[in-house]
């Protein structure tokens, strides 16, 4: 799971990790992200608070050159613009983008997140 490292997004990443119990899940800020962190993943998640964070530059570049066809990806944010941005940077990678998760108030229900994750895993 790659995030922009903001407190709000990291607070959403933690219950996603909880919903993925039984999987080897790592939460990594985009600043510390290395390409090989995502290459072996069967499913990955991206989250940012605002569109085009500077820390996502390397990730954007990588996603434009590597094919993730049939690998599932979930994106989450607190803004529609950020969800659109995240969906856009995945386009060239051909990752199987699931339904996006929007938390406009920064809050969440673990049951809703678990349901969202289970849908992505189908």
Task: Identify the function of each model-found stretch.
Residues 1-4, 77-79:
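Short beta-strand/turn micro-motifs composed of small residues
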Residues 7:
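Short, surface-exposed ligand-recognition loops at beta-strand->loop->(often short) alpha-helix junctions
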């Amino acid at each position: 799971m790659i995030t922009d490292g903001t407190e709000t997004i990291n607070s959403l990443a933690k219950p996603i990790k909880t919903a993925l119990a039984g999987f080897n899940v790592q939460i990594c800020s985009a600043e510390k992200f290395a390409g090989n962190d995502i290459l072996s993943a069967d499913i990955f998640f991206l989250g940012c608070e605002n569109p085009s964070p500077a820390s996502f530059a390397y990730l954007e570049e990588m996603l434009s050159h590597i094919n993730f066809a049939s690998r599932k990806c979930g994106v989450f944010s607190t803004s529609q613009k950020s969800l659109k941005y995240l969906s856009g940077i995945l386009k060239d990678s051909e990752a199987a983008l699931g339904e996006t998760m929007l938390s406009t108030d920064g809050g969440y229900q673990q049951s809703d997140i678990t349901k969202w994750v289970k849908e992505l895993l189908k």
